[in-house]
Amino acid sequence: MRLSTPNLQLNEQGKLRHFLTIEGLKQHHLTEILDVAESFINPVTGDISKVPSLHGKTIMNLFFEPSTRTLTTFEIAEKRLSADVVNLNIETSSTKKGETLLDTLWNLEAMLADVFVVRHSESGAAHFIAKHVAPHVHVVNAGDGQHAHPTQAMLDMFTIRKHKGDIFDLKVAIIGDVQHSRVVRSQIQALSILEAREIRVIGPKTLMPSHPEALGVHVYDHIEEGLDGVDVIINVRLQNERMKSALLPSEKEFFNLYGLTKERLSYAKPDAIVMHPGPVNRGVEIDSEVADGHQSVILEQVTYGIAVRMAVMSIIIDNAKQLNADKQITKKVTEEARS
């Protein structure tokens, strides 16, 4: 699903007000997130700092889809920023009793929320919410349907940059269910904006986008050919819950043809890194020997997700403070000019 509304997530100064999608953002928006995330990590110990940036702010995590890593890392990030954190229990919420999403939203807004972190099964849900929140409220998309997962893409970019330096000139291969993955869509957009040299997608035709040329990617049917000489390998899981029909003979057959094994990894550069946004299905998209091997940075992705999500939330709050301060200065100058 294409939701080309980049201006919705920018304020009148062209800075992030919401973080809904990678699409439509400029390179400086992405590098700012990466740089701020870096500032939260101790360069000696690798520990992630606790800072008072969001002290007094209330963040509500509205997860209408199951999540372990994303919800937990968001909650840790929010607490590291010293925010007050509320997790909405969907199973006991009023949406289960017939209340509309908007009514739920407005009631939560009345409880003085500053940021909504939203995960929803419907593509466009985060955009819908962002269109209806009060001017002082911010929305961060934690994954909506098949559309986007921007914070996951940014933590992946951060992980790549930590290991490879500049993303420019890298060859990146993405293996798996490209057609149904919101993560892949956001990854491709981020890699394109950050000027990766080449983006390859590998998998069966039934799991490839119908118009890959529009995404600026190279499609490979054979994994060995697709992995030849790449710097970064990203595995993604099969999105069985989003497939409307059987697109594969079996998971075993998928692994036989596209599973990342030690032998297949040897086609990439010797220092290539192996990534996976999770959850990892061992023996389906990746072999345990590779997932646990020295080239795997899968667990680092989880850790870096805390710093990146801290960066996103601190940036949107800081941008709002700066905008309000500038408006006050403009108002004061205007009043003085009139007097």
Curated annotation (Swiss-Prot):
GO terms in the biological process aspect are: 'de novo' pyrimidine nucleobase biosynthetic process; 'de novo' UMP biosynthetic process; amino acid metabolic process
Q: Which residues cross the membrane?
A: none
Enzyme Commission number:
2.1.3.2
**Molecular functions per Gene Ontology:** amino acid binding; aspartate carbamoyltransferase activity
Hydrolase is among the record's keywords = no
Recorded hits in InterPro entries, A to Z, give:
Asp/Orn_carbamoyltranf_P-bd, Asp/Orn_carbamoylTrfase, Asp/Orn_carbamoylTrfase_sf, Asp_carbamoyltransf, Asp_carbamoyltransf_Asp/Orn-bd
Binding residue positions for L-aspartate: K97, R182, R237
Say yes or no: keyword Transferase present. Answer: yes
Name a single GO cellular component.
cytosol
Give me the reactions it catalyses. Answer: carbamoyl phosphate + L-aspartate = N-carbamoyl-L-aspartate + phosphate + H(+)
Q: Where does carbamoyl phosphate bind?
A: R69, T70, R119, H149, Q152, G278, P279
Q: Which pathway does UniProt place it in?
A: Pyrimidine metabolism; UMP biosynthesis via de novo pathway; (S)-dihydroorotate from bicarbonate: step 2/3
Could you list this entry's UniProt keywords, alphabetically sorted.
Pyrimidine biosynthesis, Transferase
Broad enzyme group: transferase
Cross-referenced Pfam families, in alphabetical order? Answer: OTCace, OTCace_N
What assembly does the database describe for this protein? Answer: Heterododecamer (2C3:3R2) of six catalytic PyrB chains organized as two trimers (C3), and six regulatory PyrI chains organized as three dimers (R2).
Role played? Catalyzes the condensation of carbamoyl phosphate and aspartate to form carbamoyl aspartate and inorganic phosphate, the committed step in the de novo pyrimidine nucleotide biosynthesis pathway.
Into which family does the record put it? Belongs to the aspartate/ornithine carbamoyltransferase superfamily. ATCase family.
Protein name (record):
Aspartate carbamoyltransferase catalytic subunit
Give the organism the record lists: Hydrogenovibrio crunogenus (strain DSM 25203 / XCL-2)
